From Swiss-Prot:
This is Nucleoside diphosphate kinase. GO terms for molecular function: ATP binding; metal ion binding; nucleoside diphosphate kinase activity. NCBIfam families: PRK00668.1. It comes from the Bacteria. Homotetramer. Keywords: ATP-binding, Cytoplasm, Kinase, Magnesium, Metal-binding, Nucleotide metabolism, Nucleotide-binding, Phosphoprotein, Transferase. It comes from Wolbachia pipientis subsp. Culex pipiens (strain wPip).
Length: 139
């Protein structure tokens, strides 16, 4: 079993609807630990760079607009198989397909405002964590 780090973003809809504490409970109950956390307002440039992988997709502009529409909470999670474990507790990207008992299944209604982001691979987790945090902040 590998101890991994992964990035979590509690999106503007989660912050606005004051469900960040509930989401953190799901994270902690899964056995993952939050080792770094920061509340911030992403600039358009930051959102474009972070989601650059989606720049040619039709939803890119809407995604950037949404992610800059309010505060987000970026977190680094650590634990056994953190990337896959967090993806499991997030639930399917489309909340309509997400199981009950997952973050999206319990708290989200719309695919474009689905409450959370999580790294989709260990490689992307390293890149995404470095985007927001210096190594010395991860304690």
């Amino acid at each position: 079993m590998a101890i991994e780090r992964t990035l979590s973003i509690l999106k503007p809809d989660a912050v606005k609807n004051n469900i960040t504490g509930s989401i953190n409970s799901y994270i902690e109950k899964s056995g993952l630990k939050i080792i770094a956390q920061r509340k911030m307002l992403l600039t358009k440039k930051q959102a474009e760079l972070f989601y650059e992988i989606h720049k040619d997709r039709p939803f890119f502009g809407e995604l950037v607009e949404f992610m800059t529409s309010g505060s987000v909470i970026v977190q680094v999670l650590i634990g056994e198989n953190a990337v896959s474990k967090y993806r499991q507790i997030m639930g399917a990207t489309d909340p309509k397909q997400a199981d009950k008992g997952t973050i999206r299944g319990d708290f989200a209604n719309d695919i474009s405002e689905n409450r959370v982001h999580g790294s989709d691979s260990l490689e992307n987790a390293h890149r995404e964590i470095a985007f927001f945090f210096a190594e010395c902040e991860l304690v």
